[in-house]
Amino acid sequence: MISGEMSRWTDAPRERTHALGLVFPPAGDHYTGMQLDFIGAIAETAQAYGYDVLLTTGSKAGDHPFQRLLAGRLVDGVILMEIQLDDDRADLLSELGIPYVLIGRARVEKTSWVNLDFAALGRDCVRHLADLGHRTIAFVNRSEHLFRSGYQSAHLGQEGFVRGVTELGLTGRTYLCDDDAAAGEACLERILLEDPATTAVVTMNEAGLGGLYRGLKRAGRAVPRDFSVVGVVAGPWAERVTPQLTAADMPAAEMSRVGVELMMERLKAPDAPPRHVLLRPLICTRDSTGPCKPVPGPDS
């Protein structure tokens, strides 16, 4: 439902504000390191085009921060992030005729977007581990809240993981994990409790990564001698853990740059066909994966 205030957005010519709205809700109680990387890169790229960036939250169309941004007519266009498969924020922007782009991908494609091929990356991580001899692998996803809300990367990444283990005849389990180190440690404990034969983890939860490592240390599993970890995270964060994480590095700077470029294109030619950019970075082999070492049995 469009309020009377917002319905007047395109009723009359408007002067350009030379500002972009960035609608980016934090993953949990605070922004993760990867999210902060995106915010900084988007602001830097927008500045190069002569635009300021107004950051606000709002994961749903009815959330007050999102409503205030639109009702105030403070921006020329909107960049949406933390995309859900069925994203009512995008639906509202389309209904209002407000130029917008996605960093992410919704189920219904109404505008330009840039995204990672999370499904393919999930499969790539499984193949990397399978090539090292791992047969029992766990997938550590994002939080239950994000998954149940339809968070697109969580769903696509898990679909790719499941497809990968199925195609290769491996044993795989999936786990939802809150975005913090304590949750990562608890998740790792649960993984080993439910299947002690697990020798590797694929993760998309960079905020829980330190906890996964801590849990492995507590369990007496050395990385990568006894246990391998591979993920999809931003490169700087993969390099901050010890041993450094083998990962498909999320190109936050490139995705941010492309997102702003797509926004500029929408502002210049709003009636042009939308453009879609799908990125699939290669796995960067660092120090957290190695050949599978069989898990000793209880009598060993």
Region spans (language model):
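Bacterial carbohydrate/catabolite-sensing allosteric modules
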Residues: I2-G4, G40-Y49, S94-L102, A106-S300
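Alpha-helical recognition/docking segments in bacterial nutrient-uptake
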Residues: I2, M6-T10, R14-R127, D195
